Amino acid sequence: MATWKNLDTLASYSKLAELKGHVNIADAMAGEKGAERVKKYSTPMAAGLTYNYAAKQVDETVLDALAKLADEAELIDKFQELYNGAVINTGEKRMVLHHLARTQLGEDVVVDGVNKREFYVAQQKKAADFANKVHAGEITNENGEKFTTVVQIGIGGSDLGPRALYIALENWAKANNTSKMEAKFISNVDPDDAAAVLASVDLAHALFIVVSKSGTTLETLTNEAFVKNALVKAGLNPSKHMLAVTSETSPLAKSEDYLTAIFMDDYIGGRYSSVSGEAGAILSLAFGPEVFAQILDGAAAEDKLATNKNILENPDMLDALIGVYERNVQGYPATAVLPYSQALSRFPAHLQQCDMESNGKSVNRFGEPVDYVTGPVIFGEPGTNGQHSFYQLLHQGTDIVPLQFIGFKKSQLGVDVDIENSTSQQKLCANVAAQIVAFACGKKDENLNKNFKGGRPSSIITGEELTPASLGALLAHFENKIMFQGFIWNLNSFDQEGVQLGKVLAKRVLAHDTDGALKVYSDLLNI
């Protein structure tokens, strides 16, 4: 079994810490040296993607130190224990099995006589069969008419990931004639969110997916009641318009208020559930089960790469190690995720939850305080929009923020126009290439207001086109990166106690069980 130790107790980390500022990236990326780095520092990913880290502050010395850290921290051994069913979520005493929802990397994992790989595949098949029946008109509304829109009601991991994936493939599906149903999402307990979505759909032809593992999530049940009320007012039977995605032990599981129930379990956390049955329901309804299967295939292929002990052939682990070097040695406080693809407009928000909810911890997996910084702040926007928003701080601010670019050679719809000898897609790609070099190399100017120091590190993931398979690989890459970083920091990346306290206090407010500042704030908001 692997040994779990704090980062600052590892000899390899002490050696790595001696390499602070070792590479001057402005110098390393200049001229022909930079050209050679771009060719050299590149690692294949799954589904035709490539992870290029030429503009990161690494060289052979730093990479060797990172490899030694990976070995001493036993990263691959810990990953193997995870996918073979060890109790990695120490806080909740649970296994962590989201990889098993897309592939089997190791041994059978059996719980109470149930093979978990078979269970996850069965739930995905259940979602696929339901979607096929809806598309074929075998499952219809009260009047025997086909459903045309599907609306998911959920919050957190039940919203951010599925929403990001749907938006990512919406145009691809149109271009490839796989659009089956329009999808929408209700997440916030703010009534304006639900009201706006309901006003935009034809209720008689709308199908609603209620997603709550526990069946008790306040925001989700509140929004479900909001939707049921609207359906009843429209003279419709809610039970003919709703299905549930929940656990087998939740109150929703055997309720007759739903057309069917698709099950998830406690071994896949919400933020890691985008390639499980949970997201499979809405994505299969929107695009067809075959498209969701391609997402799973891309993720599975990336997972297999993540088992390689050689960091130069394991893009997920390499990205994680470089991130730890930037956070703990270089002292950078944040990471910006910058997809130069409008289709990935909600991907940074999903990664924000996945990363910050996983590694935003100040105690190790044994509940002991750590004496080093852990997860960075994650934020981002698609390019080129972000260039006209927060890039000013990234270029000339007092903090250095590492950047993770994502770019594709082709657009999804293939509709473009040539203006001034270049297409819109070429202009988009030109901007991302220019930004990488501008951040790394900067530009000297005697006017300090126009001087760019450079030295801002970045990586880029590139591909031919954003497809279901490449989207799955992209998602798995970042999930695995977050996992490896949690291993290095000796954290439990799979619980989220920070979400709970506010929920408890909110229930007190609603029950009017308040005093002190909580009472004054409640009165201020007229609760």
Where are these regions (language model features)?
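Acidic, Ser/Thr-rich peripheral helices and adjacent loops at domain boundaries
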Residues: 415-450
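Extended, charge-enriched "interface" segments that sit outside catalytic cores
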Residues: 4-143, 421-429, 440-441, 463, ...
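Active-site phosphate/pyrophosphate-binding segments
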Residues: 230-415, 454, 501-527
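Flexible, glycine-rich loop/tail regions that form catalytic "lids" or insertion modules at the edges
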Residues: 2-74, 313, 317-329, 344, ...
